[in-house]
C-alpha cells in the first residue's frame, strides 16, 4: 500500500492506483536526442449574464496541449498516429461547457463535453495512445434554504491502443447516473447519493458487459472554529453480465467486481492557535484489496 501503481497481470502493465504497492521513478538511460517542446493553452469564456438584458447563460471553451518530439506539425499535435517514430509525447485536451442558471441561484444546469488524446512514445518497445471522451449534464435544484437536490448523467468512451503489447489494447464505453441530496446545517454538512452505471467494451478480442449500483454518504461536523471531522462512506455492488471474469481498470470507474466498501475519515483540530493536529483513517475492502487499513497523523506548529 501507499504506492502510486499496481501491476495488472491481465494487461501486463502498471495501473495508477493510490493504494498500489509500487512507486514510480524516472531513470534516464541510453543516448539523448534533441527534442522540440511546445505547450499551449486557450481559454474562451462568454458570460451572457453580465449583459443588462442577458439570459442566465455562460459558455466556456478550453484547450491545452503539451508536445515533445523531433518534428512539429499540426497532425502530430492534433491527431498523432500509433506508428509515429518522431514523437516523444503529444497530449491534447478540449473542454466545452454551457452553464444555465437562475437569477436567484435556486437552480443550475450544466452541459459539458470533454475529450483528450495522450500519445506516449517514451517506451523504447513501442507507442501507446490513450483516448478519452465524456459528454454529460449535471446540476442542482434548491428544495429548501438548507437543502439541494443534485444530479449528474454522462456517457464516456475510453480507448487504449498499443503497438507492442497486444494485451494492453482495450476499449470501454458506457453511461453513469447519480442523484444526491445535500443538507447543510449550522454545524454540519451531509450528502446522500445513489449511483448506477453500465459499461461495455472489449479487452483485446474478448467482450464484456458490466453494471454497478451503489450508495455514498459524505458528511462534515464542525467544532466551532477549532476544527472539523469528515466522513466518506461508499458501498457498491458490481456484476459482469457476459461470463467474462475480468474487466479493465477503466470500467466501473476503477472499481472491482463484487462488493466494494471504502471508508475515509479525517480530523483537523487546533489544540492552540499555533499548534494543530491532523489524522486520517482509511479502510478499503474489495476483490483487489482485502481489509486494507491506512492511518496517517501529524502535529503542526505555526511560527
Feature names for model-found ranges:
Residues 1-303:
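Exposed, low-structure sequence patches enriched in small/polar residues
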